[in-house]
């Protein structure tokens, strides 16, 4: 597969930049409302030629729902498939990512998948550790290993902002606790979950995460397996079916690669055996995905023949 050049990335960014005007910030999390809606950046991390980047590619932003892929991988390492999927399902949903509807209407009362908020909260509740500090350090160290960036941390301001306004997520937790899906202290779980979502990265970090998943968990630069292959396979399957909220089907048709988005404007994707892509564009569409980020991935996929279908 031919390597993309930096000037090509810059041209594509300029081409899709007008789309940022059509999106909106995720103001329901107050700190995210302070982002610049015109920001747009991209990085591509290739298995052989390291990375190229353009635009606001070194601006820090929080993972938000992208962290769900990280914690799913950790939970599978900690607990194994049988336990994890006894508590969380494997099916996509047409409901909003923060909806409680399916919890109430499915006979098992378990979340449909790990990429919706209820499922992600259940996954976080499974992580090993004596307390939240130990669990959070494990999550951070996992992200540092994948990104090869030892400075990765989280934004306490964003975490606090989310914790103070997470009324719906608390209700999801209480409902799941009532039905035996989780048994954690709710406030402790919410504290850990909001900190996990507030982990800060830039596009280059995100592209490197994408590369590791593209290589089935293998780091071609460190020459070692970071995540077991079977776990990356599970994670990437969920990224295809559920990774882009209620646009996952359209994204599969228009772009055709495993990807996960977050409401801070991040998207990471992976082209199997080749490269990872990291994008930041905080102006979101109606489904909570970066509106310009979606478009640039659509153009790149068409140009480079990325689709897996």
From Swiss-Prot:
* Keywords recorded for this protein, A-Z: Hydrolase
Give the Enzyme Commission number.
3.5.1.2
* Gene3D superfamilies membership: 1.10.1500.10, DD-peptidase/beta-lactamase superfamily
User: Which residues fall in a coiled-coil region?
Assistant: none
Q: Which residues bind substrate?
A: 65, 117, 162, 169, 193, 245, 263
Q: Which BP terms in the Gene Ontology apply to this protein?
A: glutamate biosynthetic process; glutamine catabolic process
Top enzyme class = hydrolase
Q: Which reaction does it catalyse?
A: L-glutamine + H2O = L-glutamate + NH4(+)
Which Pfam family name is an example for this entry? Answer: Glutaminase
**Assembly behavior:** Homotetramer.
UniProt record similarity statement: Belongs to the glutaminase family.
Question: NCBIfam families under this entry?
Answer: Gln_ase (TIGR03814)
- PANTHER family attached to this UniProt entry: GLUTAMINASE
Protein name (record) = Glutaminase
* Species of the source: Bacillus mycoides (strain KBAB4)
